[in-house]
């Protein structure tokens, strides 16, 4: 598979390559919108989400901090790495005006093996589907999560994505939670920064498609 580097900025690509080439990050997997955009090429993405399913407290934040200090001229919030936490949101780059947001977070165990392309360890799109399904059950779901689910629905059955979402979040969400999440779609605020779609899709049509998918899913359950 060729990655869609046109979906990310040159600065993000450079940061991702630096990190991916270091053994220090072997326990981390790229997830989120950037991971999906690189594989599907459907929209631009602007940050780096790196998740690890190692045991809590095992992240070597001291070495992470040293690496980021040594490899990036500019950085923000590195002092947060001095404390043990579920995750860290940082910024790195060339200067104060040219930065990339990088998140390092603990996560539940991955349910699909990662994929390695160009030395980048990427979550399987099925894993991202499971994560996105979980994300739309939150109190205030994000527009881009619905957008990504719509793109994934061209590749996978909705029923399968629901099952993966429950498997990955078995203690926290149910099928009913997922349906309720989709029922909020008309109330979702559009992303302030907008969604730079590379496939000519429109939010109103995406909403209609997803409503139909969920409606069919519910009707099939009643049979």
Task: Tell where the protein language model's regions lie, with residue ranges.
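Compositionally biased terminal segments of proteins
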Residues: 1-223
């Amino acid at each position: 598979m060729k990655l869609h580097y046109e979906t990310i900025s040159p600065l993000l690509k450079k940061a991702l390559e630096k990190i991916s080439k270091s053994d220090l990050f072997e326990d981390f997997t790229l997830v989120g919108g950037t991971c999906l955009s690189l594989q599907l090429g459907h929209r631009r993405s602007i940050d780096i989400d790196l998740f690890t399913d190692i045991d809590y407290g095992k992240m070597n934040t001291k070495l992470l901090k040293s690496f980021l200090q040594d490899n990036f001229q500019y950085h923000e919030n590195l002092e947060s790495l001095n404390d043990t936490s579920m995750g860290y949101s940082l910024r790195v780059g060339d200067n104060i005006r040219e930065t990339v947001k990088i998140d390092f977070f603990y996560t539940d165990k991955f349910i699909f093996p990662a994929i390695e392309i160009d030395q980048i360890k990427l979550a399987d799109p099925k894993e991202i589907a499971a994560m996105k399904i979980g994300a739309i059950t939150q109190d205030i779901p994000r527009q881009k999560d619905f957008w990504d689910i719509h793109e994934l629905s061209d590749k996978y059955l909705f029923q399968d994505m629901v099952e993966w979402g429950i498997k990955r979040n078995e203690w926290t969400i149910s099928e009913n939670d997922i349906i309720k999440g989709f029922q909020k779609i008309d109330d979702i605020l559009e992303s302030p920064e907008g969604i730079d779609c590379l496939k000519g899709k429109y939010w109103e049509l995406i909403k209609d498609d997803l409503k139909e998918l969920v409606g069919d899913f519910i009707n099939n359950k009643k049979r």
